[in-house]
């Protein structure tokens, strides 16, 4: 329907990388005009199943594929809203990277937990709508989301790109706040 905005989301696995062009062509044949591609981060099932994740080389291949597809202009393809991508930033998505979780976006889970994003671990929840007023939580909590200096540890401690990525996506932090992996360094 013309008035309904939609897109196709694809979680790219290692097995999917060699099939990207054929998959794109199938989407085009079906009339799809917007396509978002995600890489799978190592949590949940993907933590213990390497077939769900892509290697660094496959990640670069994915970025090159998206860049090439965008230049062709037949489908509006873009990379997910996660991870700073250095020189690929303006080439694989329409906006410069930012993790908007808890900054301009909040999520309420089925159990009432208030978080910046449903992809973020429970220990980053900031309240619960069944016991807290949402506006109070929004106005007075979310400090770990809005002040990212606590992320300047490990791989981020001396990184010259920190001012751009601010420590990456909150969903890429494990339970103790350590970075699971850095998109920029994968490239």
Describe each region flagged by the PLM.
Residues 1-115, 120-125:
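Radical SAM enzyme [4Fe-4S]-AdoMet core and its adjacent flexible, acidic
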Residues 119-187:
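Flexible mid-to-C-terminal extensions adjoining Fe-S/redox cofactors in radical SAM and related proteins
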